[in-house]
Amino acid sequence: MIRVRTSLKKCDVSLGLRLISTTRTNPTTPTTPRKRRATVFKDTLNKGPSFEDFVSGRAAEVSLDPLERARSTVEENQRLPKWLKTPIPKGSNFHKLKEDVRDLKLSTVCEEARCPNIGDCWGGNDKSKATATIMLLGDTCTRGCRFCSVKTNRKPGAPDPMEPENTAEAISRWGLGYVVLTTVDRDDLIDGGSHHLAETVRKIKQKAPNTLVETLAGDFRGDFQAVDVMAQSGLDVYAHNLETVESLTPHVRDRRATYRQSLNVLKRAKQTVPTLVTKTSLMLGLGETHEEVIQTLRDLREIKCDVVTFGQYMRPTKRHMKVVEYVTPEKFEFWKEQALEMGFLYCASGPLVRSSYKAGEAFIENVLRKRKPLEQQQESLSAFRI
């Protein structure tokens, strides 16, 4: 019995060794490598610098994105050109407006965005020619654009229900000829705050019927219902800013804001109320090219945008993106001429121009006031036909 068991064990061991050896040396077994799915990291790595680029010292140049490449040519401590220096704001009108803003618990983009033109817009002697830009829906934005100094938070406080009434009261006190209502982005609200804005416009028109109202609103995440609510609120100018050219948009604006979405918002506002003046603004000095600015103007004319403004990007703090170029006043004048030649109704262009700067300038005011009687005539004719 012992001999039989020993021989069986020897057979088992030898059989096992044979099986192992045949498995290892079988040349017919297919060995197809498993294909890995593409990832953003993998795509970026494949498009990045090669080993030869690292050896030759070209790696940094190859890996830079367009915005960083433009910035790499900027001097770190370049001096502010003389045409960008402004006097300290002063004057009785300036201080009166500031006091009323505090008393009525209102926010202004003039202060929040540290606008260099606050003294010019608020401090003029003729109040009917002054322009104030009231910021509605609070002073905290749900988005974080890399050029903007307004506070950000995912969940800002609830909108003040008295804000439409208080804003209308302030406008009627000041006796302004033109007011701009702007707003932080409120992605936390279902309608993006469109009904709150529209109610403010209606209140102003009730208390100050001769005041022209412009709203500088966000993109409402591309929600056309919200755009329609704003366009039909009784406002005079519908403004929404592209901010920059298409290639720089992902680097400059919040990821939820896209170039095409902004164009569609302006297009929808015009389609909803064809007599509405539509307006947008572009910052220069971010690294944009001549051809890109021309293409942006073409895109705007294609959707029948009426007004465009150009201004110099100014870095609010060291935490924000750097200035690539200080554009000269002569170049701003060139862009103004280009815009007017392309058929824009009006163009404000200059180093210190902002989207709301001198919004009530005589030319655009005259255009709006001339349109009023025509609109009233059309309404009377349509009512007569009914």
Curated annotation (Swiss-Prot):
Stated EC number for the protein is 2.8.1.8
In the UniProt record, the signal sequence range is: none
The entry's free-text remark on the cofactor is: Binds 2 [4Fe-4S] clusters per subunit. One cluster is coordinated with 3 cysteines and an exchangeable S-adenosyl-L-methionine.
Q: Name one GO molecular function term.
A: metal ion binding
List residues of the Radical SAM core domain: 124-345
CC annotations in GO: mitochondrion
Where in or outside the cell is it found? Mitochondrion
Q: What is its main location?
A: mitochondrion
Pfam families in UniProt: LIAS_N (PF16881), Radical_SAM (PF04055)
**UniProt pathway:** Protein modification; protein lipoylation via endogenous pathway; protein N(6)-(lipoyl)lysine from octanoyl-[acyl-carrier-protein]: step 2/2
SMART domains, sorted: Elp3 (SM00729)
Miscellaneous notes: This protein may be expected to contain an N-terminal transit peptide but none has been predicted.
Could you tell me what this protein is called? Lipoyl synthase, mitochondrial
Q: Which organism is it from?
A: Zygosaccharomyces rouxii (strain ATCC 2623 / CBS 732 / NBRC 1130 / NCYC 568 / NRRL Y-229)
